[in-house]
A protein has these predicted regions:
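Short, charged surface segments at domain edges that flank catalytic/cofactor-binding sites
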Residues: 1-18, 93-97
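Histidine-centered nuclease catalytic patch
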Residues: 18-51
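Short Cys/His-centered divalent metal-binding micro-motifs
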Residues: 23, 27, 51-77
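Short flanking/linker segments adjacent to small metal-binding domains or redox-active Cys/His motifs
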Residues: 81-120
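Short microdomains enriched in Cys/His and/or Lys/Arg
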Residues: 39-51, 74-89
Length: 120
């Protein structure tokens, strides 16, 4: 549900998205949920700022195109917030089953709303 939310959130009303790393405009169906800080870091895994729509080429074949991803994040959020996000990766975090269940409910409801708004 979280991955779908990120892709829906970053989708434009016309059904296209702009890759955070390379800036290409592509159809929603070609969007991946790209993580700036690797998913193995649980403290940022579900951080909405850490996750953005990314084209499959950048996410899968360019190992996230991290240098350009960082530039895209700075343009979107500002350098200070990106530095704070980077600092979070060293924090240890473990989610409980209850927390996972709540995340699923929360993002399922948001996805329903966004799908309707975006006409997808």
């Amino acid at each position: 549900e979280f991955s779908l939310f990120i892709r829906l959130r970053d989708c434009m009303p016309n059904g296209y998205f702009k890759c955070i790393s390379c800036g290409q405009i592509k159809p929603f169906e070609q969007a991946d949920n790209g993580h700036y800080i690797n998913r193995q870091h649980m403290s940022t895994r579900f951080d909405e700022m850490n996750c953005n729509a990314q084209c499959r080429h950048c996410n899968r074949f360019m190992e996230g195109n991290i240098q350009n991803y960082r530039k895209g994040l700075i343009a979107k959020y500002g350098e200070q917030r990106v530095v704070l996000l980077e600092a979070k990766q060293g924090i240890s975090r473990k989610f409980t089953d209850f927390e996972y269940e709540q995340l699923i409910k929360y993002y399922k409801a948001l996805n329903k709303k966004l799908k309707k708004e975006r006409g997808l």
